[in-house]
Amino acid sequence: MAEVGGVFASLDWDLHGFSSSLGNVPLADSPGFLNERLGQIEGKLQRGSPTDFAHLKGILRRRQLYCRTGFHLEIFPNGTVHGTRHDHSRFGILEFISLAVGLISIRGVDSGLYLGMNERGELYGSKKLTRECVFREQFEENWYNTYASTLYKHSDSERQYYVALNKDGSPREGYRTKRHQKFTHFLPRPVDPSKLPSMSRDLFHYR
């Protein structure tokens, strides 16, 4: 028990240290620093079970991610990302990991993969927590959130690449997105254990 408690304390310290250290360092100018910190955080997250994560008090949130196009975002074990209209789907239960003020990573509870965006703006599931898996979470005026890549954007206009789902639930490439499009607007919805099938409750450690 003491060892587990030490992991939590260390993780909490690492995340707060990461936040303060990042404060005056532009992400684009510090790839080595950011990669090192993400590796440290990922290692500590992997030591605990999903049940243990409940002790992290706001650092990690378990949510569904609902898009204005009518779909919940899912991360599948084979690394594909898609949307579903099914509420509380197995692969739509996600963990939101707060890395710093306004910076998050998103991981599928069942798949264990992190949401990532590559240089072409394509969404995918990553086994490792890398810079492609860090997004800037912004609260918009219409009460929805947007999630922008911290690594990729249009070189000419500086317009950011956003996480987005099309009207058919397919992922929309980041280079085709704009902040005020409904494709890019999401609501993090809380998970209701009573709506999960019994098998899923055991899988996600809900009793």
UniProtKB/Swiss-Prot annotation:
The answer to whether UniProt assigns keyword Secreted to this entry is yes
Q: Which InterPro entries match?
A: Fibroblast_GF_fam, IL1/FGF
Q: Which GO terms describe its molecular function?
A: fibroblast growth factor receptor binding; growth factor activity
Q: Which domain of life is it from?
A: Eukaryota
Example of a GO biological process term: neurogenesis
Give glycosylation sites per the record.
N78
Q: What does this protein do?
A: Plays an important role in the regulation of embryonic development, cell proliferation and cell differentiation, and is required for normal cardiomyocyte proliferation and heart development.
Q: Which family does it belong to?
A: Belongs to the heparin-binding growth factors family.
Protein name per UniProt: Fibroblast growth factor 16
